[in-house]
Amino acid sequence: MNEPKFIHLHVHSDYSMIDGLSKPEDLVKKAASLNMPAIAITDYNNLYGVIKFYNMAHKLGLKPIIGITVNFFSDLINNQLTKLTLLASTQEGYKNLILLISRAYQKGYVHNNHVTIEKKWFSEINKGLILLSGGPQGELGKVLLNGQSSLISICLSFYQKYFPDSYYLELFRTNRDNEETYLHLAVDLSLSTGVPIVATNDVCFLSQEDFKIHKIRIAINEGEILQHSKIQNNYSNQQFLKTTEEMSDLFSDIPEALINSVEIAKRCNVFIHSGKYFLPQFRTGKISVEKYLIKEAYKGIKKRLNSRYLDIEKYKDIYSQYINRLDMELTVINKMGFPGYFLIVMEFIQWAKDNNIPVGPGRGSGAGSLVAYALNITEVDPLSFNLLFERFLNPERISMPDFDIDFCMEKRDQVIDHVSEIYGKNAVAQIITFGTLTAKAVIRDVGRVLGYPYGFINKLSKLVPLDPGITLKEAFSKESELFNLYKNNEDVKNLIDIAKKLEGTNRNIGKHAGGVVISPTKITDFCPLYCDEKGNNPVTQFDKNDIEYIGLVKFDFLGLRTLTIISYAVEMINTKLNLNKKRTININSIPLDDAKCFKLLKNSETTGVFQLESYGMKDLIKRLQPDCFEDMIALVALFRPGPLQSGMVDNFINRKHGRENISYPDHKWQHILLKPILESTYGIILYQEQVMEIAQVLSGYTLGSADILRRAMSKKNLKDMSEQRAIFEEGASNNGIDKKLSIKIFDLLEKFAGYGFNKSHSVAYALVSYQTLWLKSHYPAEFIAAAMTSDIDNTEKIVILINESLNMGVKIIPPNINLSKYEFYVNDQGDIVYGLGAIKGIGKNSVQVLIKEREENKFFHDLFDLCMRIDSQKITRRVLEKLIMSGSCDCFDKNRNYLLQSIDDAINASKESFRIKSFKQDSLFGIFQNELNQVKKNNLVNLVCPEKNKLQNEYQVLGFYLTGHPINQYKKELECYVNGVKLSQLKFIKRNKKILVAGIIVSIKIKITKNKNRIAILVLDDNTSRLEVVIFTELLNAYESLVKLNKLLFVHGMLNVSFIDKNIKMTAYALIDLSVLRKKYINKLIIILNKEKTNIFFLNNLYECLDKQSKGNIPVFIFFDNKEVCLNKKLNKKWFVVITDDFLNKLKFLVGSKNIELKFN
């Protein structure tokens, strides 16, 4: 091969977030297509893409050169920000790159969202590094351009001292400001000092045509439209991956700069090794880690079995099954070199349990390990459910075991902190993730940057289906309207063509949901770190796949909210049981055949139950009628798109209920050997483990090789499948199985393998579902209180759970400042006491201050007492308002309006009290106390708070009506107007039928359609249920005055069912105001009077009330009744009235609610 003339040494990928556009792999592919023997990656302030770059380079036969572009503030030139590119020439150099950039993040040196290093670090971190000066943007470049000749030698001497023969003056020719001036100064300096020069192109994109895309990408990052973007002026259209010939022409006058790029490339020899795993050492004393694992596993399994089988001699056959399985697993684990992994996981799980941190019973294929069960890593006995160890750890396919562990959401970080303390903070980090421009997002971002109207952009992005991970190409095939617009609309084509080029580009960084790395030494011995702006919360700069490539082991510490619910519910239950000296419950020891549980389940009463509360799942439960734990395991596996769309679910249900004959697996193609494997699923191949067992039984596969078969089937690799088919047929033939039968069964396996679910995971999560179901069945109040507490900030979920509690006969005690805690809890009477933390606008700190004072100094007597005892800076006026509006202060006075009016007096009194106390003026305080008592008396004037206002305030701070409902005052009227139809009854009414409904408007959303028309989406609430109503443009425009929050509205419309959530919705055809229906249906108003109500003062008030409402069409009847006379008098037409809410409220105030009657047609 001819000697290369140029190598690109300064190249940015899209991991630079702004400076680069192309994927590292695409850069390497482009370099390979240009016959370049090597290429560098020098992303801006990170090494995110190094592993992907390195792998692709090796795959295509290119030499990968690893580098980084960094910033630092130069003390030579007034702390100006300067750039520098570093390349690793040796393994030590690569480690130094890692060390430098990690230290920058750990120190928290951040400037305009970019991290900076310190120049002085080079005095200790310099070996194996080659420095490119940064061109005009580098420290030396700025010194040259500033004409500071006295600083040149000082600057050079630093780099020559620490980087002898490894510091190069970097030259650009990309048509940017000052480049050519700098270049001539740098060349002159090189000639006079002997410092070598090197040509680079500061590459940011693949081809010249990509410059426009690059500018759009920058504008997206800035949040600007294209013409307002400022940073893009720092780039030119020449910063593409030029060919060797193009670079040679560009620097034909400075050939040395080209030659040096090749010489540098030759010097860079870094290898990133893979194929070996690096685990932290688990301390076992003098005993080997293998023997320690065996000892702990045996100890654990004996403890498990002794608690279950009290007479071991009687159950010795069962005992031997467990020991044989345990020995097999231990042999595999030790042979594969993973005993330390199991022990590490065992330790932090046991620590969590010892410290009252809830841990899940298992997750994923790890629940199939008996060793894990023995070590208390899982709570699932794999032998009881026929789970396979080889699905988790396959001796015939070497890969790391991978336990996914669920912890209580609120305490998960405590476990990570514990691990950090055990293995060292510098050896533990979470794992980075990268957010990319998705199909919907890229359309919106590109459209905004190009200045297209919002409606145009919104229409296009909404045409992209909601499928997770969908690409624009896939969207075209699924949405014909999008494709047609692309073909026929030039603006759409322009936007989409640009969006396609940006789709999938890295946009931001995040943190893996649960991935944690534990390294045997410092993380930075293996991988660079990224930290937040304060230098905290370290995450690896490599994603989970790259972490695995370099041999670090990922542990998944996942947060599961359901465990928090279970823990809190059990805590409340056991506290009460302890007080009553009763036996407490252990949620991991509850029977799995509880009749009460399955009764609740079969009735689909699963709101709040883990995994089983969605509409679709409830529908499946109704159809399946599960009556055993195996059915619950199947539920988890069946409720997925594959089984639901394939007809497998219908077959399963029909077979369970005898509507279809059970066969193993198909009535045409079955074998008796398959019955024990498929019996629990009624002959349906539902689980991946069943695929493996069938291969073992029919064709003599080992379970390890059967797992390889399963993987090949799920990946649908034609070459692998062809090989596996031949092995399967031969094995079946050797077992005397008919060839045609074996081929047909293989075909069935191949079909179902795509739908097959991991049974180990299904069992573990079904167990969590069952635990929540059991708690709901036996302790509904505690369970619902715990569930509401876990969603204390989610008003919508709390409303659902309150309705569920009422359906189950559990009473809700409204918030009470003297009884409530921050969270929901169950009192001694078995009622749920509303949590103060669920009140909108009240922070946790405020609630804790209240509760602390209450616990230390007993109940608050009134609002003044509350304000006297707590500093107004801790409990502000706004917080007091929210407490009163929510009803939390009803224990002081039921009249919330009076309390609201008293806030200022109470606060002022408390401030004066605190002021006087601070001066210790006891005599003055005595005088002041008398004045305070007078203030209280003055405020005892009864300020009437209408029920409507009270409930509206309550809704504002709670998100729903708790102590009443504004619709209650219309109860009798609604029985006439809507024939008593309640929203909760709509599920029993035929679809596509027009009906009149009523409810209070609790939510209004106005949306703009593709044609720029408005539609309204309302939510009506009638205290029995809620209904979403869609009002289209014409109707909305005509009746918009009726569409107001907290207003009673009557809607005549068509019922339908949402395809998304299966909820009943309505399309409105007519909106009707209450006044219209009152005028149409009320035919008389009856006012009942007695002797006490006939004094002159009362009659004057009644006269005034009727007079203001006269000139209506509704007759008024006065019914007078006492022992002496009975009179029923219709007033003349002059007194006919208009019925309004205000009028009725005034009448009720005058004569009482019971003395008013409305009569209807």
From Swiss-Prot:
Its EC number is 2.7.7.7. It comes from the Bacteria. GO terms for molecular function: 3'-5' exonuclease activity; DNA-directed DNA polymerase activity; nucleic acid binding. One of its GO terms (cellular component) is cytoplasm. It catalyses: DNA(n) + a 2'-deoxyribonucleoside 5'-triphosphate = DNA(n+1) + diphosphate. Disulfide bonds: none annotated. DNA polymerase III is a complex, multichain enzyme responsible for most of the replicative synthesis in bacteria. This DNA polymerase also exhibits 3' to 5' exonuclease activity. The alpha chain is the DNA polymerase. This is DNA polymerase III subunit alpha. The lineage of its organism: Bacteria, Pseudomonadati, Pseudomonadota, Gammaproteobacteria, Enterobacterales. The gene is dnaE.
